[in-house]
Amino acid sequence: MSFGSEHYLCSASSYRKVFGDSSRLSARLSGPGGSGSFRSQSLSRSNVASTAACSSASSLGLGLAYRRLPASDGLDLSQAAARTNEYKIIRTNEKEQLQGLNDRFAVFIEKVHQLETQNRALEAELAALRQRHAEPSRVGELFQRELRELRAQLEEASSARAQALLERDGLAEEVQRLRARCEEESRGREGAERALKAQQRDVDGATLARLDLEKKVESLLDELAFVRQVHDEEVAELLATLQASSQAAAEVDVAVAKPDLTSALREIRAQYESLAAKNLQSAEEWYKSKFANLNEQAARSTEAIRASREEIHEYRRQLQARTIEIEGLRGANESLERQILELEERHSAEVAGYQDSIGQLESDLRNTKSEMARHLREYQDLLNVKMALDIEIAAYRKLLEGEETRFSTGGLSISGLNPLPNPSYLLPPRILSSTASKVSSAGLSLKKEEEEEEEEASKEVSKKTSKVGEGFEETLGEAVISTKKTGKSATEESTSSSQKM
């Protein structure tokens, strides 16, 4: 094998010693990464340029390594020494270039490791964000449940307040009815008192009339006694006169006049006695009738007074009972009014507390929604960065694998075409320049295609991540599928470009 192939195999073996074989490198590079989009784009540009420079330098070294001395017998030792020095210089330059490329590739791999570390940190943060995004649902459920409980309590308080208002209205109507009844009873009591006063006046009049009648009866009795005394005196005088006249007549004509005088006296006495009896009977009858009338009036007045007193006593008892009942109802009404005021104050305080709680919960919900939207935007940005890094890493991996495949196939074909120990094949400078231009143009075209694919992937990811609120898992699955498709298309394009070169 020639010097260029040995040098390439040595470089490839040094790559494998430092970074492992291609399978481990591809597995390590295929992991997700995370960083800012600006850093990833600058890294992709620098790495694509370094890859293109590495490809051109490797192809140039390959072409120069396979140059052989011309097969002329007249080559002197000075030309051989010049060729040897030229080969040494070229080899030294190639070693320096490969060393620089190795250093740059090591820096690139270190950056990849850093990106992997950042990717793991971002994945942990994404898991935390998902967990935090899953929490607001429970917060919403708790908020809805507490809101339902508060609404139920508010409805219970409203129903209790309505019931208390109905009871208050009923008690107010009862108080109005009792107040009207009390006023009616008061009016009845006043009428009874007026009637009692009138009856008392009548009783006083009857008493005065009875006293007057008693005085009249006493005067009549005195007059009757005086009349009787006068009558007795007159009768005695008349009898004395008659007796004197009879004695005188007896002296005149005792025998003839005695029977007639006795009969006359008897008749006069009988007349006076009948007149006195009639007067006494008439006086007694008048007194008895007057006394009966007065007794009847006094009995009626006494009965009326007794009924009035009983009625007054009954009215007083009813008034006292109604007063006690009114006082009790007034106290109950005042207590109910105080309870209603306390209920209204407590209800107002509870409603204010519930309103404050609802406002606090709504503000918390708005904050949670804004925080969720911010986390969704951060997640979308991180997902865009992750997709861009996945695309870049997949493109770099495919480019490296394609370069390794191209160099290995190119070295084998050249070694198979030049089996002689001293081949006289020399690559012309035109072929070397065309190869370098093809490599650089392929690198630029690949870079442009990669940028276009990255823009398309970012647009696709931005379109898909706009629906993150509907489902994180669905968006993530679609992004992974699009990443795989993009990596596959990049692999196919890099393979086709390597085959064309």
UniProtKB/Swiss-Prot annotation:
Keywords: Acetylation, Coiled coil, Developmental protein, Differentiation, Glycoprotein, Intermediate filament, Neurogenesis, Phosphoprotein. Residues 1-87 are annotated as: Head. The modification N6-acetyllysine is found at K290. The keyword Phosphoprotein applies. Disulfide bonds: none annotated. Residues 130-142 are annotated as: Linker 1. Residues 409-501 are annotated as: Tail. Residues 143-238 are annotated as: Coil 1B. Residues 488-501 have a biased composition (Polar residues). Residues 441-501 are annotated as: Disordered. GO terms for molecular function: structural constituent of postsynaptic intermediate filament cytoskeleton. Residues 263-408 are annotated as: Coil 2. The keyword rRNA-binding does not apply. Residues 88-129 are annotated as: Coil 1A. GO terms for cellular component: cytoplasmic ribonucleoprotein granule; myelin sheath; neurofilament; postsynapse; Schaffer collateral - CA1 synapse. O-glycosylated. The modification Phosphoserine is found at S72, S219, S335, S498. GO terms for biological process: cell differentiation; cellular response to leukemia inhibitory factor; intermediate filament cytoskeleton organization; nervous system development; neurofilament cytoskeleton organization; postsynaptic modulation of chemical synaptic transmission. Residues 239-262 are annotated as: Linker 2. Residues 94-407 form the IF rod domain. Belongs to the intermediate filament family. Forms homodimers (in vitro). Forms heterodimers with NEFL, NEFM or NEFH (in vitro). This is Alpha-internexin.
